[in-house]
UniProtKB/Swiss-Prot annotation:
InterPro entries: EF-Tu_GTP-bd, EF-Tu_GTPase, EFTu-like_2, EFTU_2, G_TR_CS, P-loop_NTPase, Small_GTP-bd, T_Tr_GTP-bd_dom. It comes from Lactobacillus johnsonii (strain CNCM I-12250 / La1 / NCC 533). The keyword Chloroplast does not apply. Mg(2+) binds at residue 27. This is Elongation factor Tu. Its main location: cytoplasm. PANTHER family: ELONGATION FACTOR TU, MITOCHONDRIAL, ELONGATION FACTOR TU-RELATED. Residues 20-27 are annotated as: G1. The lineage of its organism: Bacteria, Bacillati, Bacillota, Bacilli, Lactobacillales. GTP hydrolase that promotes the GTP-dependent binding of aminoacyl-tRNA to the A-site of ribosomes during protein biosynthesis. GO terms for cellular component: cytoplasm; cytosol; external side of cell wall; Gram-positive-bacterium-type cell wall; plasma membrane. Residues 175-177 are annotated as: G5. Keywords: Cytoplasm, Elongation factor, GTP-binding, Hydrolase, Magnesium, Metal-binding, Nucleotide-binding, Protein biosynthesis. Disulfide bonds: none annotated.
């Protein structure tokens, strides 16, 4: 790890991503952004197939995994996540969307808003993505400019429906494919898009002063060095020599010391809230840490099984349930980076919950999870998202 190039923190760092309906051009836009910025010396061009990297997608052209690319504008350093578009893989968006300070919503002018457009806006709202910039894609394929105006109005209305400022959200029109193919006019549109992202999505106020917390996304072993846990730092900071606890999924809390830190395959002196990092842990075996746990400052977070949550239950049109549910319903609760089954107890006087309802209820999980007031989660059943919410009270 030591001999790697050093990651220099010069420009402010922002996490963004592309969201929107399958085949509307999210990955093409991501490729176009890196290609245009590479011409300006601010990025390495990533082609579509590099971003679209998971092997099982190739046959169907559907993005499954979450791709991270990095690039710079004149003002900022960006980590850009290409969120999966296909409903089957919405689970990955849930882990991914939580990593975004802002999002570029891609809507094909040929189609207008589609079911997943709505689902992604809802999820963005629930996982705390505060700012959305709209890219109306494929405008070269629409002959009538009034149709494009109509699509823009539809998108603005949809954003307003989910408490985004639909009237004020910036909307950029262009063709990602034409920009990727080198059309100078469309390349300028991409530059304009990134200027807009620079201006409209504020540099996030990081939670660097709070105690360190990092949900574990992945675990791997470096031969001769030890076990690395990787993920996005939720809050606080971490550096080599810090003591950390591994919390969640079991009652036992493992203690360790950070012996190495890297970001984008470069060593890092200090990891801060918002950074995607790999943390090398002293004396920890591969089987002592797993996805779904958290690394945390000692004593800062505990595991719990019982909590109250405020939850929005998706309606049928959003891809949710078609029927109500009752007390004793046992779906999956997706916390941080993993699913845990939980039993729902509805409040007194509430006999059932209908799709589209907003409700507070009590949950008992089958495994202890590192949670606290404000921790966000989604509720899933049979591979699809049926609700989203956050912890309002810890009960144990």
């Amino acid at each position: 790890m030591a001999e790697k190039e050093h990651y220099e923190r010069t420009k402010p760092h922002v996490n963004i991503g592309t969201i929107g309906h399958v085949d509307h051009g999210k990955t093409t836009l991501t490729a176009a952004i890196t290609t245009v910025l590479a011409e300006d010396g601010l990025a390495q061009a990533e082609d579509y197939s590099q971003i679209d990297a998971a092997p099982e997608e190739k046959e169907r052209g559907i993005t499954i995994n979450t791709a991270h690319v990095e690039y710079e504008t004149k003002n900022r350093h960006y980590a850009h996540m290409d969120a999966p578009g296909h409903a089957d893989y919405i689970k990955n968006m849930i882990t991914g969307a939580a990593q975004m300070d802002g999002a570029i919503l891609v809507v094909a002018a040929t189609d207008g808003p589609m079911p997943q457009t709505r689902e992604h806006i809802l999820l963005a709202r629930q996982v705390g993505v505060q700012y959305i910039v709209v890219f109306l894609n494929k405008v070269d394929l629409v002959d009538d400019p009034e149709l494009i105006d109509l699509v823009e109005m539809e998108v603005r209305d949809l954003l307003s429906e989910y408490d985004y400022p639909g009237d004020d959200v910036p909307v950029i029109r262009g063709s990602a494919l034409k920009a990727l193919e080198g059309d100078p006019e469309q390349q300028d549109v991409i530059r304009k898009l990134m200027e807009t992202v620079d201006e409209y999505i504020p540099t996030p106020e990081r939670d660097t002063d709070k105690p360190f917390l990092m949900p574990v996304e992945d675990v791997f072993t470096i031969t001769g060095r030890g076990t690395v846990a990787s993920g996005r730092i939720d809050r606080g900071t971490v550096k080599v020599g810090d003591e950390v606890e591994i919390v969640g999924l079991t009652d036992k809390i493992e203690k360790s010391t950070v012996t190495g830190l890297e970001m984008f395959h470069k060593t890092l002196d200090l990891g801060e809230a918002g950074d995607n990092v790999g943390v090398l842990l002293r004396g920890i075996d591969r089987d002592q840490v797993e996805r779904g746990q958290v690394l945390a400052a000692p004593g800062s977070i505990q595991t719990h099984k019982n909590f109250k949550g405020q939850v929005y239950i998706l309606n049928k049109d959003e891809g949710g349930r078609h029927t109500p549910f009752f007390s004793d319903y046992r779906p999956q609760f997706y916390f941080h980076t993993t699913d845990v089954t939980g039993k729902i107890e509805l409040p007194e006087g509430t006999e059932m919950v209908m799709p589209g309802d907003n409700v507070e209820f009590t949950v008992e999980l089958i495994k202890p999870v590192a949670i606290e007031k404000g921790t966000k989660f989604t509720i899933r059943e049979g591979g699809k998202t049926v609700g989203a919410g956050q912890v309002t009270e810890i009960l144990d």
